[in-house]
Amino acid sequence: MERARFIIIGITDHPAPWFPPEVLDVIRHGKIFSGGKRHHDIVASLLPEGAEWIDITVPLDTVFEAYHRAAHFSEGAPIVVFASGDPLFFGFANTVKRKMPDAEIVVYPTFNSLQLLAHRLVMPYHDMRIVSLTGRPWPEFNRALIERAEKIGILTDKEHTPAAIAQRMLEYGYRDYIMHIGEHLGNPQQEKVSTLTLEEASLREFTMPNCVILCGKTAEHTRTFGIPDASFSLLDGREKMITKMPIRLLTLQALDLPHRHVLWDIGACTGSVSIEARLLFPHLQIEAFEIRPECEAIIQENARRFGAPGINIHIGDFLEATTPATTPATTPIVSTMGSPMGSPDAVFIGGHGGHLKEIMEKVLTVLTDDGIIVFNSVTSPKVPTNSRALWDEACQDLGLQQGRPLHIQLNDYNPIEILTAFKSNKL
């Protein structure tokens, strides 16, 4: 059977699109067409009599089943798809390549929406950081903010609207940006370009489709390496319920976070480890687990204070929590973000409540083969339980290989050992 053929044509929101002769010839001789409802409304008058139209709607699997049927019965005729802007710029051509990798694809692009908005603003865009929030969650946008990208182009959707974006930025203290919004770009009757403060944008509604360009008001922003302990909100004002800054930074080093993807912070308390990790390594997916309900507000307050969006907070007993490997699901743990919980390749155990081995055993059901577990053992005459002995026993019983411990005495605080463990087959 011949492989499927696609001709994917980019269009703007203009109600009377202009096409070069080559593209007009493709349309005139086409038999099977596809696109969204908006695209159909724009090109309907150009379609030949008797043309078949396949709507692009969710679920996409249904759309591609129709494509497979059409390709099978079309005797080699291409499926002509209309898509927004440049079909290879976060566009439908990428979806076709992923879903039907053997298909033959020809693309006729036009300007994408962010290019059109930059043109209207007479703004160079070679230095623009691009983030797509169309059908995607916040992580890449969070990363762009934390890394203080000076110019961010954003593709929006009905959930990630300009107002929602502005509200998120204000919530986490990223106020030093102005927002440019383009609505219905390419449509001479409906096109609108606005330049607003974040406060103004957060209170307005914008028609779809739209896109956003954020421009930082300041070119430089300094961030300290290590957040002072006194800057955090604490649990009941108890300064001992926070991993101290020098220990915190050494713990992050032991976790090897530049080369990790998913960090679990078990016993997060104030969120200091998660927040420090979020700001220093914004590529990470971070899951913070804490049994005390009152800590949820503390972690959220600290995350907002230090501009650390995207920490997924889970409140409940970790040993009863639903994790990726929990089958059947036990008690669902509460997440404030609703993001899928990825399998960790870095785990910090900051609190164990006397159940260190049980926690480690559960972690091992989801830890990646190259993952690492880090635990800070505190020696204190006030604590009858020897946490180092618990760690050694757990590692031995669970078949973990230990790394070399790091011994630290910080001022007049109790001595600490930063301990690491790996799956034995990886050492």
Model-flagged regions — what are they?
Residues 1-106, 115, 283-286, 290-292, ...:
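Class I S-adenosyl-L-methionine
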Residues 2-8, 21-22, 77-79, 149-240:
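A contiguous loop/helix-start segment that scaffolds small-molecule binding in enzyme catalytic cores
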Residues 14-15, 84-149, 319, 391, ...:
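Class I SAM-dependent methyltransferase SAM-binding "motif I" and its flanking Rossmann-like core
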Residues 212-217, 410-427:
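Core SAM-dependent methyltransferase catalytic element
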Residues 260-269:
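Conserved class I S-adenosyl-L-methionine
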Residues 270-282:
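Conserved SAM-binding loop of SAM-dependent methyltransferases across substrates and taxa
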Residues 281, 367-369:
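Helix-to-beta-strand junctions that scaffold the AdoMet/dcAdoMet cofactor pocket
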Residues 291-325, 332-334, 338-342:
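S-adenosyl-L-methionine
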